Amino acid sequence: MVRQTFKPPAATPNAGMQSVVKTFAVIEALVERGDATAAELAELVDEPRSSVYRMLRTLQGLELVESGSRRGVFRPGVGLVRLGGSVLTRFDERTVTMPVLERLRATTKETVHLSVRRGYQAVFIERLHGERAHSLAIPLGGTLPLHVGAAPRALLAFEPHSFWDEYFAATTVEPWTHRAPRDEAAVRDLLEETLATGVSISDEDVVLGVATVAAPTLDHRGKARAAIAFNLLPDVLRSDRDSWAELARSAALDASHRFGYAPSTVSSTK
């Protein structure tokens, strides 16, 4: 395995900024490792051990770093958790994803929309109209049950299976059109497919004449923060299903990165 080295940029404006960059490199390396000694961090950031130790002592005083379970070992502190949590709670789904929604609309020429989960419902909170007229007739602020349509199912799929059980215990699955899944078992199959592929597709199961491709936007914990989707004609979807799915998947991954999602650091809750 190749060892990752956390090195500051070669050129920095002044000594003060250089110190900040080096300190950040130490924090980044410690977060990546989980815990480490001063010597291990010094090797990772390519700095003298004595300098790294002084940084750690300063960070410890700010509660950004704390002593680990073994002597001489450091780990991220509660202050770092508080700081990160404070930043994340200020991330608004609409604001963070807007650049992604705009690019997706420009690429597909289709109407794109954003939805979030509120209880057992998916709430549509943003829509950017495309060049074509077809669209789901759901107003901003409108809702759909979580098993109905591509975006709602994208949100439900990335909840724990225990939530699926809770949802279906409280919900009666009835098809909205003749092309919709007809029972709980059929919906669960679609959820498992979405969980495996990262994409949810509705082919006329909400409104006849309208298909939708959606994908979940995940946060730093791997939780579904929102669902990005676009509408298109069913025949257009069926002509190149894989390419349309990849566009939704790529857009959602871009938005997920903006929420701090990193696949290598997230463990499954399923």
Listing of model-derived features with the role each one plays in the protein:
Residues Y261-K270:
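Short, highly charged C-terminal tails/helix-capping segments
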Residues M1-T95, L253-Y261:
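N-terminal helix-turn-helix
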Residues L146-G149, D165, D242-A262:
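Short, solvent-exposed cationic patches
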Residues R70-T171:
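Amphipathic alpha-helical effector-binding/dimerization core
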Residues V65-S67, L114-S115, T217:
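A structural signal for short hydrophobic beta-strand segments in well-ordered beta-sheet cores
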Residues A180-D254, T269-K270:
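Extended hydrophobic
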Residues V2-F6, A133-V206, K270:
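Short, solvent-exposed recognition segments
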